[in-house]
C-alpha cells in the first residue's frame, strides 16, 4: 500500500459513493471507496471531517 495523506474538509454533499468536500478554497469529490479512515472534528459547527486518503489521490485532486 502507498502513503496516506490526512485531509480536513467540510462535507457539503454526500451521495452513495462519494463526498463533496470543501477545504476552505476548493471543492472536490472524494470516492468513499478510496477513503481509508474518517473522523468528525469534534469542535466543528459544520460537518468538518478528517479523511485519510492515498497520496496519489490527494495529488490527483490537487489536495497536496
PLM feature spans:
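Catalytic phosphate/metal-binding cores of nucleic-acid and nucleotide-processing enzymes, i.e., regions
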Residues: 1-64
Amino acid at each position: 500500500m502507498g502513503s496516506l495523506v490526512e485531509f480536513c474538509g467540510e462535507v457539503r454533499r454526500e451521495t452513495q459513493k462519494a463526498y463533496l468536500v470543501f477545504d476552505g478554497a476548493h471543492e472536490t469529490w472524494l470516492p468513499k471507496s478510496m477513503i481509508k479512515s474518517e473522523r468528525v472534528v469534534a469542535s466543528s459547527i459544520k460537518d468538518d471531517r478528517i479523511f485519510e486518503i492515498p497520496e496519489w489521490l490527494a495529488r490527483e485532486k490537487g489536495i497536496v
